[in-house]
């Protein structure tokens, strides 16, 4: 079993870290620079920064905030939200990001995945895929624009396609589980991990220590991402790692 990663996520709106349930009911939870440093010091393996309204508002990402966060941390840093061109990606990497997360723009322009992987290396191209279960329970669809638009695209087919196009990693969020604290969507996560050779980061729904274990055991995922659980100090990164070590999950100390 490969070494697993614990990744806090900063969902940023108007320069502040926010959190909601199923991308709705947004509330302010803190300053992104302060929280980034806090998680870096706690021993997080990576940090994800998502400007959650950049695409919907048709604007660029908050570059200044990205630069300030990058100055405060010494762990791999992924940035996403509103990136729609090679120029956008180049600017974010120059601002201090180690990886970029593509979501809505990649669905609208598949060529961006292939070109960005070619120019910048697939190791820094993370495909963020938000999935929602179909009403007839026959599988999952890809949703974009912060969950506002159901594309009708079959999620598993999309995973296979983006892997072939050069995505180096999948950041998989279950819209059904997001913010509920009822546990990760294990069925969705396992289904994705089974059909792709690239690492899968599970996101959405984590509510307790056992949820981390459930999604990381048996190679269900390569990494687990959480937000509100860490923001509200219900658990620390150290708590999670100590628990996983006791459960014999390979993790960086």
Curated annotation (Swiss-Prot):
Q: Name one GO cellular component term.
A: cytoplasm
Location(s), subcellular: Cytoplasm
Under Enzyme Commission nomenclature, its number is 4.3.2.10
Predominant cellular place of this UniProt entry's protein: cytoplasm
**Single GO biological process annotation from the record:** L-histidine biosynthetic process
**What are the recorded GO MF terms, alphabetically?**
imidazoleglycerol-phosphate synthase activity; lyase activity
Mind telling me which InterPro entries this protein's record contains? Aldolase_TIM, His_biosynth, HisF, IGPS_HisA/HisF, RibuloseP-bd_barrel
Q: Where does this protein act, in terms of pathway?
A: Amino-acid biosynthesis; L-histidine biosynthesis; L-histidine from 5-phospho-alpha-D-ribose 1-diphosphate: step 5/9
Q: Which parts of the chain are coiled coil?
A: none
Q: Which Gene3D superfamilies match?
A: Aldolase class I
**Statement: the UniProt record of this protein carries the keyword Cytoplasm:** yes
Can the keyword Cytoplasm be found in this entry's annotation? Answer: yes
List keywords of the entry alphabetically.
Amino-acid biosynthesis, Cytoplasm, Histidine biosynthesis, Lyase
Source domain of life: Bacteria
What catalytic reaction does the record list? 5-[(5-phospho-1-deoxy-D-ribulos-1-ylimino)methylamino]-1-(5-phospho-beta-D-ribosyl)imidazole-4-carboxamide + L-glutamine = D-erythro-1-(imidazol-4-yl)glycerol 3-phosphate + 5-amino-1-(5-phospho-beta-D-ribosyl)imidazole-4-carboxamide + L-glutamate + H(+)
Location of the active site: 11, 130
- Sum up the protein's function in the record's words: IGPS catalyzes the conversion of PRFAR and glutamine to IGP, AICAR and glutamate. The HisF subunit catalyzes the cyclization activity that produces IGP and AICAR from PRFAR using the ammonia provided by the HisH subunit.
Family statement: Belongs to the HisA/HisF family.
- Please give the subunit comment from the record: Heterodimer of HisH and HisF.
The entry's protein name is Imidazole glycerol phosphate synthase subunit HisF
Give the organism, scientific name. Clostridium botulinum (strain Alaska E43 / Type E3)
Name the gene behind this protein.
hisF
